[in-house]
Every structure is written in structure tokens, then in C-alpha cells.
């Protein structure tokens, strides 16, 4: 199995990237969120999932272990193959997906293009016990702990800040942002809500 590839991104296609790991070039299928985080000619480390069947050999790539784990959990659901799992992770970020499972928000999952209520229900039933090891929303919120403290230091109640964070993080606007843009958006939207 190919676990990880180090190399330079030499091309970005609609649903994949090309990495030069001298002397080889690898085409790696990635989610739209993963692709947005990567830049041409950037040296990267991509975690991979090697998919091999008699008539199909593909490499799927991920920025971190958590994204790959969610992908592997998804392909463990009956009727969801690697391409469908990647499509799901292109419609909802892996951390937001985990949060939706933890919060039993089937509607958020069913909003992903090509995923209806039936498949969303199947995913939820299969993964709710597997992905929810404690409070996933808490681990998701750790990314923004400093921001939370900054807003509390401005005189706002911590409980209200946490409630606002959770609501904003599940919004469509937040979920389509690049990771680098999420903190600023979360800060601005939280202040708008709390200042009313």
C-alpha cells in the first residue's frame, strides 16, 4: 500500500492533482476542499488510499489522517465506493461531516449533491457509533479555542459564544470556505450575532 507521497504539485485537474515525486508523476484524486488548500509548484505531503480492483487502480489523497479516516469509514458503508466517498467529502468537509454525525444532523449530509435521504440515513446508521467517540463537536471546536477566548475577553458570555460557533460551523457558507478563511468568517459572524 502507498501510505504517503512527498512531492511537488505540477498540475491541478477538476478532481485530481498531479504530483511529481521524482522520477514518477502520480495522479491523485482529491476532494474539492483538499484541492483548494493546495497550490501549484508547492512541495506537499499527501496521505493516500490505494484503491485496487481487477479493472480499477486509483490513488486517493488527503491532507491529514482525519480526512482519510472519514473516507475509509464512508467506503465501509454498503453502496458507497471510493468515488462516492470522495464526492461526499467534496460536498461537506470531513470535520463538518463528523460534527453532523455527532449532532445527528442527517439533513446536512443529505444536502450533498447525489446523496438523498436514504443514503444519508444509511451513512448515519453505519457511522454514528464509529465516529462519535466522545463529543466530536468539542474536538472540532478546539481548532478555534483561541478565537473563542478572544471573543470572551471582549466581554461576551462563553456559553453564547460556543452556541454561535456551533451554529455558524454548520452553515453552508462556513463549510465551503478554505481553512485559512474560516477563522475570520467565524469571528465576524459571531460578533454580528452577539452584538444584536
Swiss-Prot record:
Its main location: cytoplasm. GO terms for cellular component: cytoplasm; Holliday junction resolvase complex. Residues 143-196 are annotated as: Domain III. Transmembrane segments: none annotated. GO terms for biological process: DNA recombination; DNA repair. InterPro entries: DNA_helicase_Holl-junc_RuvA_I (IPR013849), Hlx-hairpin-Hlx_DNA-bd_motif (IPR003583), NA-bd_OB-fold (IPR012340), RuvA (IPR000085), RuvA_2-like (IPR010994). Residues 64-142 are annotated as: Domain II. GO terms for molecular function: ATP binding; four-way junction DNA binding; four-way junction helicase activity. Residues 143 are annotated as: Flexible linker. Coiled coil: none annotated. Gene3D superfamilies: 5' to 3' exonuclease, C-terminal subdomain, Nucleic acid-binding proteins. Residues 1-63 are annotated as: Domain I. It is found in: Cytoplasm. SMART domains: HhH1 (SM00278). Keywords: Cytoplasm, DNA damage, DNA recombination, DNA repair, DNA-binding. Pfam families: HHH_5, RuvA_N. Belongs to the RuvA family. Homotetramer. Forms an RuvA(8)-RuvB(12)-Holliday junction (HJ) complex. HJ DNA is sandwiched between 2 RuvA tetramers; dsDNA enters through RuvA and exits via RuvB. An RuvB hexamer assembles on each DNA strand where it exits the tetramer. Each RuvB hexamer is contacted by two RuvA subunits (via domain III) on 2 adjacent RuvB subunits; this complex drives branch migration. In the full resolvosome a probable DNA-RuvA(4)-RuvB(12)-RuvC(2) complex forms which resolves the HJ. NCBIfam families: ruvA. The RuvA-RuvB-RuvC complex processes Holliday junction (HJ) DNA during genetic recombination and DNA repair, while the RuvA-RuvB complex plays an important role in the rescue of blocked DNA replication forks via replication fork reversal (RFR). RuvA specifically binds to HJ cruciform DNA, conferring on it an open structure. The RuvB hexamer acts as an ATP-dependent pump, pulling dsDNA into and through the RuvAB complex. HJ branch migration allows RuvC to scan DNA until it finds its consensus sequence, where it cleaves and resolves the cruciform DNA. Has three domains with a flexible linker between the domains II and III and assumes an 'L' shape. Domain III is highly mobile and contacts RuvB. This is Holliday junction branch migration complex subunit RuvA. It comes from Borrelia duttonii (strain Ly). The gene is ruvA.
